[in-house]
Amino acid sequence: IIYPGTLWCGHGNVSSGPNELGRFKHTDACCRTHDMCPDVMSAGESKHGLTNTASHTRLSCDCDDTFYDCLKNSGDKISSYFVGKMYFNLIDTKCYKLEHPVTGCGERTEGRCLRYTVDKSKPKAYQWFDLRKY
């Protein structure tokens, strides 16, 4: 399913090429960049010492953070709002990044950790992290 007025926002894309964007160009450009993230983990794939047990692809936190910021700064306020709500709030997903071992959660909201506590005395390793709410 692709969000109306876009070619890249949803499962896959329906564009005829990498330069084609839908009516909501700003939102679509955010989705296109997100779709082209160089560090992704498909469902069932193992990478960086982690296994994606979700039924959908998960991305590096860098790519998800860039997507979040892009949507927030989009000129297409309504479409970016709905795409952001769908991806960050409705899909229960996580991202991964290289960080010192997580020891707990310093701040939590709506079941998601907003601020992690880490053990800086130990080496960094790839771990799963909750996405921010949109």
Curated annotation (Swiss-Prot):
One example GO MF annotation: phospholipase A2 activity
Cofactor(s) this protein requires: Ca(2+)
Short name of any one Pfam family annotated for the protein: Phospholip_A2_2
Assigned EC number: 3.1.1.4
Metal-binding is among the record's keywords: yes
GO biological process: arachidonate secretion; lipid catabolic process; phospholipid metabolic process
Cellular component terms per the entry's GO annotation: extracellular region
Residue ranges of coiled coil: none
Tissue: Expressed by the venom gland.
Enzyme class: hydrolase
Residues annotated as binding Ca(2+): 8, 10, 12, 35
Catalytic residue list: 34, 64
Glycan-bearing residues: 13
Highest taxon in the source lineage: Eukaryota
Disulfide-bond pairs as recorded: 9-31, 30-70, 37-63, 61-95, 105-113
Keywords, sorted A to Z: Allergen, Calcium, Disulfide bond, Glycoprotein, Hydrolase, Lipid degradation, Lipid metabolism, Metal-binding, Secreted
Subcellular location: Secreted
Cofactor binding mode and count: Binds 1 Ca(2+) ion.
Reaction catalysis annotation: a 1,2-diacyl-sn-glycero-3-phosphocholine + H2O = a 1-acyl-sn-glycero-3-phosphocholine + a fatty acid + H(+)
Main location: secreted
Family: Belongs to the phospholipase A2 family. Group III subfamily.
UniProt function note: PLA2 catalyzes the calcium-dependent hydrolysis of the 2-acyl groups in 3-sn-phosphoglycerides.
Protein name: Phospholipase A2
